[in-house]
Amino acid sequence: MSLPFSQDERDLAAGGILTIDLAALRHNYSAIATRIAPTRTAAVVKADAYGLGASRVAPAFYEAGCRDFFVAHLGEAVALKPFLKPDATLYVLNGLQPGTEAACAREGILPVLNSLEQVENWAALATRLGKKLPALLQFDTGMSRLGLSAKEFDRLLENVTLLSRIDIKFAISHLANGDEPGNAANARQLAKMTALLARLPKLPAALANSGGTFLGKTYYFDLARPGIALYGIDPERQHDFSDKVAHENKKPKHSILPVLPLSARVIQVRDVDKGATVGYGGTYVANGPMRIATIAVGYADGLFRSLSNKGAAFFGDTRLPIIGRVSMDSITLDVTSLPEGTLKLGSLVELIGPHQRLEDVARDCDTIPYEILTALGNRYARVYVYVNGGGTSTTA
C-alpha cells in the first residue's frame, strides 16, 4: 500500500510559497478600528478573503475584535459561517438571487438589498414567516453599480407596509473614488448620503470603504467596511505609478503592514550564448553570454503575462529581471549578476516581499493590487504564520 501524499510533501512539490501573516492582518484591522472608533469596523472577506483563505483570515479578524463580515455571495457566507463564532454577523453585498431568501434567513445571514425587487422578495418572505427580517439597504449615491436609485427610494418610502416588514440594520452606500482623497466625487456622494439619511431618521449608516476610512470623520458614520487596506495595501499608494525607486522608498502613511511574502522555486539554471532566444515567440534575445533560471510559477499562478520582459524577482538584494514571455507554469529570469552556483534546483526567489511590494508587481502588470491578490490561486504552498517582534511561528 502506498503512503498518502503528506502536507509537507505537497508543500515541497509546490512551485512557490505564499506566506500569509495573520498577525499583520490583525494589526491592520486594529489600526483602522482604533483610529475610527467609536465607529464599528467590519471586514470585507469576499472572494475567499481576497484570495488568502477566508476560513483562516476571518477568524484572525475576529480575534482582533471584528464582529461584522461582508462577502459578495450567499454561498460565501454559508461556507464561512462554521469558522466564526455565533456573535459574528455575515452580510451579503450582492443581495439575494430569487429563491434563495429562505436559505439566507434560515442561516441567520443578512442580505444587502440593492433593488426594489430584492426588497419586495425579502418582505414577502417576512410576511410568510410572520416576523420582521433583518437586512441592510443600499443606495446608489453616484457609482451606478448597486443600490436603490433616488426614484426607487421615493417609491419605497411611499410603501409603508413594505418597509414595516423589514428590520433595516444599516443604510449603506459605496464610494467610487474613496482612494482618491482630492476627488470631488467623494464630497458629492457624502452629500447625497446625508440627504438620504435625513429621510430615514435614526437609521445607522455605512459609507466608508478602505479609502473612505482615511477621508475624515464625516465619512465614518456608524459602520465602516474596509477591504484592501486590511490585506496590506495603502489605498492611496496603490495607484502610485511613479518612478520605481521613489515608489519603493515611499513610506506607507497609515501604519498598514504587508501581509503576504511570496516566493517561487527554481526548477532549472542554464548558460546561454549570445543570440539565444528565450520563451514563446523568442521575444527576448541574449545580447551576450548569460545565465538564466526558470522558476516554477506563471500566469496560472497570478503572475500575469503582462510581466513578460518587464517585471523582476529578487534573490537577496539582487534584482533578477524577467526575460521572455511569462508562460502558464514558468517564468525565466536573468541571473547573470549572481555568482555561479548561487541558485540551484529548489532555490527560492522573492516575488513579493521586502524588495518589492504587491503594489509594485501590480504596477509592472499595468493593473491594481486587487487583481493580483485575488488571482494568486491555489497551487502555492500556503503557510499561515504569526510574526511577532522578529520571531515567526507557523500555525497549524
UniProtKB/Swiss-Prot annotation:
<feature type="modified residue" description="N6-(pyridoxal phosphate)lysine">
    <location>
        <position position="46"/>
    </location>
</feature>
<feature type="binding site">
    <location>
        <position position="328"/>
    </location>
    <ligand>
        <name>substrate</name>
    </ligand>
</feature>
<keyword id="KW-0413">Isomerase</keyword>
<feature type="active site" description="Proton acceptor; specific for D-alanine">
    <location>
        <position position="46"/>
    </location>
</feature>
<dbReference type="InterPro" id="IPR011079">
    <property type="entry name" value="Ala_racemase_C"/>
</dbReference>
<comment type="pathway">
    <text>Amino-acid biosynthesis; D-alanine biosynthesis; D-alanine from L-alanine: step 1/1.</text>
</comment>
<dbReference type="GO" id="GO:0008784">
    <property type="term" value="F:alanine racemase activity"/>
</dbReference>
<feature type="active site" description="Proton acceptor; specific for L-alanine">
    <location>
        <position position="280"/>
    </location>
</feature>
<dbReference type="InterPro" id="IPR029066">
    <property type="entry name" value="PLP-binding_barrel"/>
</dbReference>
<dbReference type="GO" id="GO:0030632">
    <property type="term" value="P:D-alanine biosynthetic process"/>
</dbReference>
<protein>
    <recommendedName>
        <fullName>Alanine racemase</fullName>
        <ecNumber>5.1.1.1</ecNumber>
    </recommendedName>
</protein>
<dbReference type="InterPro" id="IPR020622">
    <property type="entry name" value="Ala_racemase_pyridoxalP-BS"/>
</dbReference>
<dbReference type="InterPro" id="IPR001608">
    <property type="entry name" value="Ala_racemase_N"/>
</dbReference>
<feature type="binding site">
    <location>
        <position position="145"/>
    </location>
    <ligand>
        <name>substrate</name>
    </ligand>
</feature>
<dbReference type="Pfam" id="PF01168">
    <property type="entry name" value="Ala_racemase_N"/>
</dbReference>
<comment type="similarity">
    <text>Belongs to the alanine racemase family.</text>
</comment>
<dbReference type="InterPro" id="IPR000821">
    <property type="entry name" value="Ala_racemase"/>
</dbReference>
<comment type="function">
    <text>Catalyzes the interconversion of L-alanine and D-alanine. May also act on other amino acids.</text>
</comment>
<dbReference type="InterPro" id="IPR009006">
    <property type="entry name" value="Ala_racemase/Decarboxylase_C"/>
</dbReference>
<keyword id="KW-0663">Pyridoxal phosphate</keyword>
<dbReference type="Pfam" id="PF00842">
    <property type="entry name" value="Ala_racemase_C"/>
</dbReference>
<dbReference type="GO" id="GO:0005829">
    <property type="term" value="C:cytosol"/>
</dbReference>
<dbReference type="GO" id="GO:0030170">
    <property type="term" value="F:pyridoxal phosphate binding"/>
</dbReference>
